[in-house]
Amino acid sequence: FHGYLERNWPPATRNRHLRGYRLSVRNMLRAHIRAHKHIHEIYRGKGWTPDARVGIALHFMDFAPSRPGKKRDRFATWLAEQLFQDEPSMAHARGHFLPPYGFPHRYNNFPEGSGDFTDFVGVSYYRRFRVRFHPRGRIVERPDSSAPTSDLGWEIDAEGLRRVCEACHESLGKPLFITGN
């Protein structure tokens, strides 16, 4: 995310269609699914019990529209949630790759097969992200200037951790572990 969209970390590139970002996320998703299958095959093949618990730790943000009364900000917020959280977590868990990580009608959206590919979810939550629509289609953060912030300037919102955990559990139905806060 940071390397392709914000250019903060390697590869520090951006292109119009986010091709590099999509491909890197798609490759990470496929690697997780393959590792999950392989680890479980090894455990079952050796008769080891209890079976391995293979999960994912994902960075979640509590996305909120900067201006809740503006349809454009609400849409940009929904889009940010889909791209950054919902679609990657569903692909990890179920193997279903939705756009932009999957390609409807042209390719198989279950490149590693459909199934249940995570046994738990690690939730790393650090901030609330207030989204403001940008006419060029970028996802732009507009923090609430009155909200408390961390040393990194990120908006602190303890209730956001609860909201993120509830949404994650509702969509995936997996045990949750707080892996970062």
Predicted regions, residues:
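Active-site region of glycoside hydrolase catalytic domains
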Residues: 1-181
